[in-house]
Structure formats: C-alpha cells, structure tokens
Amino acid sequence: MAMTAQVKAELASTQVTKTCCRKAEVASMLRFAGGLHIVSGRIVVEAEFDTGAAARRLRTNIAEVYGHQSDVVMVQGNGIRKGSRYIVRVVKDGEALARQTGLLDQRGRPVRGLPPAVVSGGGCDAVAAWRGAFLAHGSLTEPGRSSALEVTCPGPEAALALVGVARRLGIHAKAREVRGVDRVVIRDGDAIGQLLTRLGAHESLMAWEERRMRREVRATANRLANFDDANLRRSARAAVAAGARVDRAMEILGEEVPDHLRMAGQLRLEHKQASLEELGQLHDPVLTKDAIAGRIRRLLAMADKRAEELGIPDTESSLTPDMLADEG
C-alpha cells in the first residue's frame, strides 16, 4: 500500500471522543476538501475525498456532532482522474453547518483561512485540524532525498493558518506556492515522524521509518561499494571517527552545548557518511564546508576542555583502532 493511502486509512479509523476535537476536524476537512456553493438560492456544503473512509468519517461526524444529514456520492475515475472520488454534500442545512463550523463568519462571509475557534483552540484541536487537512488533501512520499509530507490548500490564507497550527505543535512547516497551487510542506524526517505520531498514525510511522532506515543503509552500502579511491575511503573513515567524537562530546557537555554547535553536531551524528560539504548543504541556513567544520571543531575542543576539568575521558577516547587504521 502506498504511504499516503496507508496514512489516510489509519487516520480515518482513529477514535476521537472529545467534541471540540471532532468539531476542529470537521471544520478542517470541509475547508481543505470542500467549498460552499449557491444552488437555487441555498448554500450547499460539499467536500471531495479520494477515499471512501474519509468521506464516511466526515458524514458520521456531521451527523453526530451537528445533527445534520449529508449524502455521499461516488464519482468514477476518468482519463484525468484515475481513482474514484467521494463527495460529501449537505443540502438541507448547508448554511447552518457552514456557520456552525466557522466556514462563514457572523456576517455570512466566507472565511478564507481556518475558523478562529480552530486557530486559537487547544493542542488537541491543532492535532485534529491537521488530521482533517491530511485526510482532505494530504500526501506522504516515500523516504528519500525528496521525501515530504504535504497538504494542498485552497488558498494562501488556509496554508498560512495550517503552518501556524503546526507551529503550536512544535513542528516546522513551510507554505509554498508551486505552479499556482498553495501547499504546506514538511521535509524534515524527524518532523514528519513527530506529526504522524501526534495524528495517531503509529502503524504508518513504523512502516515509513523502516523504509527510511532501509534506504539509508542501502545508500551507505552503495557509497562504500563505489569508493574506488583510497582518499574517499579515508574521508569516510574520518567522518565516522568525527561522528564518534561528536557523540562523546554531546555526552560530556549535556545541556551546556550552545545551540549552533549542537545543530552542527546533530547533523554529523545523523549523517555519519556525509562529507563536510554535504553537511553544510543540509544545515538550515546552508553553511560552507569551512563553517560547518569550524563549528564541529569548537564543539570537540569545548568538550575536551570540560573533560579535562572533570578528570574524565575526552572525545578521542571514543575512537576505535578501525577508525584510526591507515589504508593498507
């Protein structure tokens, strides 16, 4: 099963009991998957999904939380859209639902971002809003160089609102316009894992992390297999040795590590085979090879000085004979 489909299937079956969370999820699903239409002078609420489970979840929540009936219509795929689409439509009480969910403000005007009750709600409401947005128009690509969790948004206001909701959860997301389409994107692997955990997609997270780990191991093996140059092998060994020293430095300093040095050290630990130039490219903002090397040197020097003061083994104590061996 593709990652997006797996996540949506799991989220659609997640049990949510708090009314405030169910309201936030409904509002988000309607905002990101739907719209308001005027039919014969009446406001009709519609939302379109690519899974029947998401459509049925929305219909159930609308009925149980707001007491309104809705219809679910399946539209078969055609040449442009291969998969079937599921449309949830509220005709009779469309205007009432639009006002109750905050899609219309007190003056009857459409809300372009997310409803104020969702934006200013609690942490559980923020989680529910993201769950609804992902069920509506989310995608998760396979782990790799371009892996990302994305949500396609109805407009820039909704995108910025979703970024703000992510920030409340401690997750860094970016709003981007690509070929006229507004998207919210999360690229950092750890942030993706954190969000999937908060949303309740635990099985999907395990599958994604397993594929991510498998890819990293395969990439490392491929790089080592292609090392037909002794200098490259020495560079790889030096990178691994630096990683071991950084790990010991973090252990020695604990909470005393300055943030900018901690970030450089974390990059070295997370990408043990990467060159200094590659580490600089991974840093946010991007750093030169010399800048990232300087930060790692300062981290090691700071840790060695602290180790000497405490009378404990320094960072070089973490090196093994294999790391120090020369090419034969």
Curated annotation (Swiss-Prot):
Annotated region of DNA binding: 275-308
Q: Which GO terms describe its biological process?
A: cell division; regulation of sporulation
Database matches in InterPro entries: Homing_endonucl (IPR027434), Sporu_reg_WhiA_N_dom (IPR018478), Sporulation_regulator_WhiA (IPR003802), Sporulation_regulator_WhiA_C (IPR023054), WhiA_LAGLIDADG_dom (IPR039518)
List the protein's name. Answer: Probable cell division protein WhiA
| Biological role stated in the UniProt entry | Involved in cell division and chromosome segregation.
Residue ranges of the TM segments? none
For this chain, the family text in UniProt reads: Belongs to the WhiA family.
UniProt keywords, alphabetically: Cell cycle, Cell division, DNA-binding
Presence of keyword Cell division: yes
Q: Which GO terms describe its molecular function?
A: DNA binding
